[in-house]
A protein has these predicted regions:
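N-terminal capping segment at the start of a domain
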Residues: 5-21, 167-169
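Cofactor-binding active-site loop characterized by glycine-rich and histidine/acidic residues
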Residues: 12-15, 27-157
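Short catalytic-loop micro-motif centered on adjacent basic/acidic residues
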Residues: 24, 136-138, 193-197
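Generic beta-sheet signal
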Residues: 54-56, 132-136, 163, 213-223
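Conserved thiamine diphosphate
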Residues: 130, 178-207
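A short alpha/beta connector and helix-capping loop motif
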Residues: 145-170, 218-221
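Short, small-residue-enriched loops and turns at beta-alpha junctions
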Residues: 171-176, 227
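Glycine/aspartate-rich loop-and-adjacent alpha/beta segment that forms the canonical ThDP
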Residues: 201, 205-257
């Protein structure tokens, strides 16, 4: 898994340099979570619409490049295709389009919607008595949206133990209105809540496979924006929505863990 995550980060850097687009630090903070989810969930790259697949939704849509690279390394399409990221004619937009990109279940970008759709899908699957599961990855800044908490109220009331919410707790939201002690808040909403080190794939996989005890599960992943590159992690705000020069890309590639 370490090699998988390093390869994903390398491609994020190279594609951002090539395209001039991408939120590199926030993409880096979710790499291990994406790797863990795609190693645990049921999915079929040869048949992205497979009826028995589990559902994954990336609600923090500005990390789309990390999702594309994860899908590519999971076999959904060649990595070289993603080098058109952000181009006018490309299917790989700066925010994902479910009608165009294999493996993308929801078009996202406006924050706070992913958890609502995920709860609705989980409820529908529960009514159908389907064994399929639903996963949604949200950001801590996104958690300022009331819709996140409304969807969790519904999920807890309906006992949606087939729903797992992963929180990218990279704490960059501390500049504005910080979400303090998020695990306590999720427990107060009657969610089965687990706190893990968000860059430890084995810990994430253990949390994903742990019993939900009849409740929606929330995994609070303690992450670092820009994780994997010292320069990005120490200067995350300076790199917000910024692509590297050729020299900077080579430096960052050399720093990758």
């Amino acid at each position: 898994m370490d090699c998988f995550c390093k390869s994903v980060r390398q491609d994020i850097l190279r594609i951002s340099r090539h395209s001039g687009h991408g939120h590199i630090p926030t993409c880096f903070s979710v790499v291990e979570m994406l790797a863990a989810v795609y190693s645990e969930m049921k999915h079929n790259p040869a048949d992205p619409s497979w009826d028995e697949r589990d559902i994954f939704i990336l609600s923090k849509g500005h990390a789309a490049l990390a999702h594309y690279c994860t899908l590519a390394h999971s076999g959904y399409f060649p990595v070289k295709d993603v080098y058109n990221f952000g181009a006018f004619s490309s299917i790989f937009g700066c925010h994902a389009d479910r009608h165009r990109v294999p493996g993308v279940e929801l078009s996202t970008g406006s924050l706070g919607h992913g958890s609502c759709v995920a709860a609705g899908i989980a409820l529908a699957l529960k009514i159908k008595k389907s064994p399929r599961k639903v996963y949604v990855l949200i950001g801590d800044g996104e958690s300022n949206e009331g819709t996140v908490w409304e969807s969790l109220m519904v999920a807890a009331h309906q006992k949606l133990d087939n729903l797992t919410v992963l929180l990218d707790h990279n704490k960059s939201q501390i500049r504005c209105l910080p979400i303090t002690r998020p695990a306590d808040k999720f427990r107060a909403f009657d969610c089965e809540t687990v706190e893990v080190e968000g860059h430890n794939v084995n810990a994430l996989r253990a949390a994903l496979s742990a019993p939900a005890n009849g409740k929606p599960k929330v995994i609070v992943a303690d992450t670092v924006k820009g994780w994997g590159c010292r320069t990005l992690a120490e200067n995350m705000f300076a790199w917000h929505r910024r692509s590297p020069s050729k020299e900077e890309m080579e430096m960052l590639l050399g720093e990758l863990k």
